[in-house]
Each structure stands twice: as C-alpha cells, then as structure tokens.
Amino acid sequence: SAFPIEKGISYCRVFSVFFPSYNRGYGNNFSLQLGAFVFGAVNLDQIPLVISGKFSLPKTTSIGILNTSFALGGMYVQIPFEFFDEDIGLGIAFGTDTFGNNFNHFSTSIGWGYTRYSGDWELDDDPLINIAGNFRFTDSIALIGEQWFIPDLDLDDSPLILSTRFIGRKFAVDFGGIMTLENIVEGILPFPIINFTYHPR
C-alpha cells in the first residue's frame, strides 16, 4: 500500500521462508526495507541483497472510503558476483495509489523494471501493474489479495496471490497461495506460501 511505516516503528518479516527483511519508518513519510533472498545453506557472498525505500506523500483526500494516499518508491537487488562474471543488479521504480484505511484498502501500483550490467543502466519500456487489496474481517483475521500484470505475459498466466492473515499483538502469519487463472481452470493446486511478521514494539 501507499501507507508509510510510522516514525520509529519497525518490524521483521519473512516472505515464503526465502525472503527475510527488516522494515522501519523514518519521519512520517519514509519507509526503508533491507532484505535478502536466502535459498538453503549458502555462503554470505552468494546471497542476493535487497534494499527498497518508499516515500508516502501527505494525504490529499480524507472522506470515508475516498481516503486517498500516494507513494513513490524503488527497489534494488544486488546479484552476487558468484553467479555471473559481471557486476549485475536489477530492480523496479514504482508509484502506488491507495484508497481506504489501514484496515480496509485497495491499491493500484505501476512500476518500471530496470537492470544494471557492468555499470550500464537500462529501463524497461513497458510497465508492470499490480492491483492489491486488504479486507479486515475481524481484529485478528484479514483477507489479502493481489494480481500482477506483467509485460508480454497473458492475463491467464499472470500471478495471482491470495492469503488469509492471522493477526496477533506482535505476530502475524499469512497462509495462502500463488496461482494463475489458467491453473484455476485446469484444477492445478496453488503454490503454497506462508509469511511471518514480528513487531518488536
């Protein structure tokens, strides 16, 4: 979403076991994430490192469901030298528009991927689009969903993620799956995902 992490608030998150991250809010508008992609027992110099930042603009509208928030951000992934002979990185620059509040909201995001190869930067011509939503059934249960639209990929093959979030005082756990419309039609089971979030304070 376009919502910022509040000033001084931090949390640790593990996405599908492979992507642990530390997230923190600075000031009232800037959020920072530091993470890594960890696949099994590998050396530290073989782990792709991730840094991302998001600047949430001051809210412009605050009337019920029309409560609107905007954010601009970017993510960068440094690929280890072990994988390629050259210095390689990739990432995305994006903008997000969110309607609603922290409990129930709907977001649309558009972003352009980019790559860095031996010091040369290249921006993709076509954008990625993401539509996401969060619906809070109770104080402790929420439904989370997002649909990706990827250039040169048919809608039937685009990733769809659905999960149920169980929310505690300091912990939250997501159980869900990644699927495509084609998988659903063919009766193929979703790829399972499980996420953990811990709020120290």
What is the role of each PLM region?
Residues 1-106, 112-117, 148-152, 156-201:
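Transmembrane beta-barrel domains of Gram-negative outer membranes and organellar outer membranes
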Residues 108-153:
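A mid-sequence, solvent-exposed acidic-amphipathic segment
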